[in-house]
Amino acid sequence: LMVHEVLGVKIALGDHRSSFPTTQNVLDLLTQIRVGGMIAGKIGVLHIHLGNVTGAFEMFEEIVNRGFPIRHIRPTHCARDKYVFSKALEFAKRGGRIDITTGGSCCFESPADAVEAAWDAGIEPSIMTMSSDGHGSVPRFNEKGEMVGLGVGGVACNLRDLKKLIARGHAVEKVLPLLTRNVARGLGMKGKGEVSAGNSADLCLFD
């Protein structure tokens, strides 16, 4: 975390490709991230790839119940399946930030539907983000669960679902922060995420 560009650590939980760390392993890692962030002047986040094996959110609950700040725990792929999504909503209602992946597996017809379902469930829009998982590896499996190939995730999914949500009548000022301000604030990136005097001029223009 002393390296300027480093904001935290990424691991996988609840996935057949993960190392299946124990709750204490994860808590040890979170403590190092938190202390490193305090020294470096950053939030320090544990970015967590969620699979469809149960147990990850139960682990988060135990860690938070023991007094560890929830803001350091950042699960992604939160709409991978219905179970993960339901647990993600519980996590968000405790103040945890959740991320909906726009590329890859989704238990709804589209990630935009997952975002709407979270809003309908009363989740505060400011603690939600969307991400594409772009350029990530995308394994392909056959009906037997055997991997038969490996692809690369696309990067256009965020824009696709942004357009869907706006086309459905949601205000731009509610939808756009999923990809801008919410991300910047969640990662503690000062001067990023919104158009304001003194901020970086990171602008995209759309017709």
Model-derived regions, located:
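His/Asp/Glu-enriched, well-ordered alpha-helical/loop segment
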Residues: D120-N199, L203-F206
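Metal-cofactor-binding active-site regions of metalloenzymes
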Residues: L1, E5-S19
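Active-site core of metal-dependent hydrolases
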Residues: R17-F20, N25-F141, E146-V152
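Sequence-level motif detector for i,i+2 pairs with an aromatic at +2
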Residues: H4-V6, I70, P125, A201
